[in-house]
Amino acid sequence: MSVGADRKKTGTSLTGKVVAAYGRHFEVEVAGGTIYSCVVRGKKKGVVCGDEVEILPATGDQGIIETTLPRTSLFYRSEIFREKLIAANATQLVFVLAVVPSCNLELLDRCLVAAESQGIRPLILLNKIDLIGQDEQRQAVAHHLMFYRELGYPVLEISAKISVQPLIPLLSGQTSLLAGQSGVGKSTLLNALVPRAQQATAEISDALDSGRHTTTHVRLFHFDADSSIIDSPGFQEFGLQQLDEASLARGFIEFRPFLGQCKFRDCRHIAEPGCKLLLAAQEGMLNSRRIACYHKLVKGLKKSHPWMETNKRV
């Protein structure tokens, strides 16, 4: 028997948006604001928060997801043996960093590459600026942020405990995905933006009997009539096994002027002679840390695809 087959079907199908995803259960909001508690028909997989779907109403507030409509974007991470879908149809990635814990720049770079691959606009948000202490720490943080500003990424510095007002105009008209490592204050930020968010999180935690009210699922909140915020669990790692080498390279936006300019058309920008990317790095035109991050990502692809070998040029 397929999942949900024991639910009595009623009426015709409705189109709605997945506003919460936890396990195999989903909340789908249809026109007028009615929310159905849904499961997926059969063995269909891949439904994610933010998806536009067609559901078949069942008894009461129950429903069955029958179809997932085409997406404009899909933000997810992928390891060698599994992938984790996070959100669909996001137009903006708000990557949250914090003074404490210290900035994980590799995690930021990986998420920027994922966003670039899907055409999602990135916004870098530094939270907890009230905790910046010594001059050395302040200078280090300022140096990191200036680098990304010079790349062309918007960067905002706030303390969610003091005021989120500077962030509000940047959320207007967007479906913004909040992402970042654990402990950077995403929950505090969300609760300041959407006062009901904490209550909604607690309700799902109670329903799942999880015993904890930290974010363990993905949920969409309406910020205003034209804007939404998708909250996601914190993470410490972000694999990009879904991307090939060309997509990885293009994900580092400062690499783009040099791509296609190398001596060899199939240059992988690892150690090939005549590589314009490596030459630019040697001349100080590209950041060595970002080059190293790209090389690490390519090396990770080789581990998941053993047949892939570095081209040797002479």
Swiss-Prot record:
GTP binds at N127, K128, I129, D130, G180, Q181, S182, G183, V184, G185, K186, S187, T188. Its cofactor is Zn(2+). InterPro entries: G_CP_dom, NA-bd_OB-fold, P-loop_NTPase, Ribosome_biogen_GTPase_RsgA, RsgA_GTPase_dom, RsgA_N. Signal peptide: none annotated. The keyword Metal-binding applies. It is found in: Cytoplasm. One of its GO terms (cellular component) is cytoplasm. Pfam families: RsgA_GTPase. Keywords: Cytoplasm, GTP-binding, Hydrolase, Metal-binding, Nucleotide-binding, Ribosome biogenesis, RNA-binding, rRNA-binding, Zinc. It is an enzyme of class 3 (hydrolase). It comes from the Bacteria. GO terms for biological process: ribosomal small subunit biogenesis. PROSITE patterns: ENGC_GTPASE, G_CP. The keyword Zinc applies. Binds 1 zinc ion per subunit. Zn(2+) binds at C262, C267, H269, C275. Residues 78-238 form the CP-type G domain. Monomer. Associates with 30S ribosomal subunit, binds 16S rRNA. One of several proteins that assist in the late maturation steps of the functional core of the 30S ribosomal subunit. Helps release RbfA from mature subunits. May play a role in the assembly of ribosomal proteins into the subunit. Circularly permuted GTPase that catalyzes slow GTP hydrolysis, GTPase activity is stimulated by the 30S ribosomal subunit. Belongs to the TRAFAC class YlqF/YawG GTPase family. RsgA subfamily. HAMAP family: GTPase_RsgA. This is Small ribosomal subunit biogenesis GTPase RsgA. It comes from Nitrosomonas europaea (strain ATCC 19718 / CIP 103999 / KCTC 2705 / NBRC 14298). The gene is rsgA.
